[in-house]
């Protein structure tokens, strides 16, 4: 029992360390990493905040469709802080990292991992483990919505496979179908 508790505390400490390091990385390193793609995400959020919408009919990307993407986080923040893009970017990335950690934990638990291992998975999912990961997930946040959706999809699929109650299975299946359509519309 004592060893199990120690393992849980160790996992919680590692998760907290990962979260603190990622938070510090986002807050302290913001200025060094802003590029035109990141700025365009904020320009879209500013545009949507002025329109009062989360999805724009007047802004189009040349290569993708955006339904469930970073604008769902950045736009409300831009409406709250329209003159502080740095704050919007930093808070938005922190919120997206929290969503990524939560979805990783859900996925791990749904796949049958013990709480401590799911917590480690959540911590590692928000850790800067390479330059590319930092650019695309941590700082850029471009693929965080896709990673969150994938974690949710895998977790729900695992729950569907283990759920025995017919009514719950139908509910999970309906969620998976809706999530599939949203993922398809969010290329």
Regions found by a protein language model. Give the residues of each.
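Membrane-interface alpha helices of multi-pass inner-membrane proteins
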Residues: 171-187
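Membrane-interface junctions at the ends of membrane-embedded or membrane-associated helices
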Residues: 1-6, 110, 157-172
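Membrane-helix interface segments
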Residues: 84-87, 112-119, 166-173
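Membrane-interface micro-motifs in multi-pass membrane enzymes
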Residues: 63, 67, 115-161, 186-187
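Start-transfer (signal-anchor) and selected internal transmembrane alpha helices
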Residues: 1-22, 170
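Extracytosolic (periplasmic/ER-lumenal) interhelical loops and adjacent juxtamembrane/interface segments
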Residues: 42-47
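Transmembrane-helix motifs of polytopic, lipid-linked glycan transferases
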Residues: 91-116, 152-155
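Membrane-proximal lumenal/periplasmic loop motifs of glycosylation machinery
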Residues: 27-36, 50-75, 79, 86-87
